[in-house]
Amino acid sequence: MRHYEIVFMVHPDQSEQVPGMIERYTASVKEAGGQVHRLEDWGRRQLAYPINKLHKAHYVLMNVEAPQNVIDELETNFRYNDAVLRSLVLHTKAAVTEASPMLKAKDERKAPEALVEEVEAEDADE
């Protein structure tokens, strides 16, 4: 089986449907004997340029190992699902399991807030 990196962007008004979509897509990969190596929900992010007069979208990244027929099925689902604004499926040479730069940047932004909370907690204890 081949390895793929899949990114899809969902309409911001349909963000509550994203967990269900992720569940369906991962289930179809696993049913075919594939494996999900990495799954990241990046949340709502600003678009570089407007798509259908929208300036934000909900991003999801998946790294999967699956047969070609499953990937074709996923691409068809993306194409006919009105909530999916854009999708990209790339063939990769190996499975990628480490956190993506987007997720690392998100964690780094949260880290200073956590440090401030720790300092405030220490000050409260004294």
UniProtKB/Swiss-Prot annotation:
CDD domains named in the record: bS6
Species assigned in the record: Glaesserella parasuis serovar 5 (strain SH0165) (Haemophilus parasuis)
GO MF annotations in UniProt: small ribosomal subunit rRNA binding; structural constituent of ribosome
Keyword RNA-binding recorded: yes
Domain of life assignment: Bacteria
Gene, per the UniProt record: rpsF
Entry keywords, A to Z: Ribonucleoprotein, Ribosomal protein, RNA-binding, rRNA-binding
InterPro entries: Ribosomal_bS6, Ribosomal_bS6_CS, Ribosomal_bS6_sf, Ribosomal_S6_plastid/chlpt, Transl_elong_EF1B/ribsomal_bS6
The protein's name in its UniProt record: Small ribosomal subunit protein bS6
Lineage of producing organism: Bacteria, Pseudomonadati, Pseudomonadota, Gammaproteobacteria, Pasteurellales
Stated family: Belongs to the bacterial ribosomal protein bS6 family.
Biased composition (Acidic residues): 115-126
GO cellular component term of the entry, any: cytosolic small ribosomal subunit
Gene Ontology BP, a term: translation
Protein role: Binds together with bS18 to 16S ribosomal RNA.
Disordered: annotated span: 103-126
Any Pfam family hit: Ribosomal_S6
Record's keyword annotation contains Nucleotidyltransferase: no
